[in-house]
Amino acid sequence: MIGKITKKLLKNIPGGSHTYSRGFDQFSSNAPEIFYKGKGAYLFDNKNNRFLDYGMALRAVSIGYSEDKINKAAKRQIDLGNNFTRASITELEASEFFLKTIKNANMVKFAKNGSSAVTAAVKLARAFTNKSIILRCSDHPFFSYDDWFIGSTEIKKGIPKEIYKLTVNFKYNNINDLKDKIKKFKNQISCVVLEPSTIGCPNSNFYSGCCGNFECKRDFKKENYLMEVQNLCNENKIVFILDEMITGFRWRLGGAQEMYNVKPDISTFGKAMANGFSIAAVCGKREIMELGSIEKKGTERVFLLSSTFGAEMSSLGAFIETVKFIKKNNVINSNWLNGYNFIRTFNDVSESEGLIKYLYASGVPCSPYYVTLDKKGVPSLMLRTILMQEMIKEKIIFPNFISICFYHNKDAIKKTRNALQKAFLIYKKAVFGKTSVYLKGNSIKPVFRKFN
């Protein structure tokens, strides 16, 4: 059941959007097809209906849509010219500001999207080690739209086997699996690529998700899975790449690496670092990063990132102001608290409806997730779509993932509680009755599937 606006989008744009996570197959059929503005934690559709949003531009907005101070900072840079023939003062200031924030990095290069940044990290690793194999964590959903990653998913069409056979998957929080892969491809591995954390903590002794506490009760300073990964990489002369697109400027200001006490060789950042403005970064140790430089005469060159708009001043200005706003307003702590309140509210309502076995929220509080199970305890995309559908009726965008922002405050949580109470009544009927009766339109689908 495709709407008129979606049909127009599909006619002009392959997939109907510029990232597959925004596709019509990721939302219930009653979801707004298009939006025209956002403010705080809310989006407005083309009919001026207001929706509380838990997608927050695919986690790119951690403060709120259209934050005045950040917008003004970007506009100031536009008025100055936005993009020059050589480097700008803003470019220098942003690089210095970034390196003061991300303590483990000696150099940084900016980009416009995370895919470019992570692929640049992989290229640096291959150049530094003169090795080809990439070990990437299969439990982390996305690293890049480039062939080295997409070829390791179900969607291999258009990618030569010679490329994707060089990417090998390993499991998160399973250090023995990583050891086995390193042993199997001994002296062939350029890098290990993973996110610091997704739905659970990096703990090698157990994998029980997140403890769920506002203040994490686990001690990561002495030992954790990421430390073991780091040690393995060091022992085997493999470049340790930490992709902090989601965790950066969200878990801690200095990234999850600050929280989990690790020092990656290369890190990548993006998403929340400029509150929705297009910017990403690859950063790391000088001895690796400087391979992409040009001043050392006679050294073989590595063609790193080279982008006309990579240092666009409006995005860099927004980045600087975003970090200042985060510091001044204690955004990191607020988002952890907002997410904790979301999880607690979700589970309180589910418990009261007798659904907690089939429907619950969990995860790191600043980036929670929810689980939808059928009466046999099996994950159900149909039930997930029904929940999304019922939340839309209450004017709440409730996507596959939950992205918490600064403005998901007590009022937003109260609105969410009221909506959940109504939505869960339908969900309960769908769990114990004929599920398909309660779904209008089609179920959502996984992004990474071989066929449409």
Predicted regions and their residues:
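Conserved N-terminal phosphate-binding loop of PLP-dependent enzymes in the Aspartate aminotransferase
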Residues: 1-452
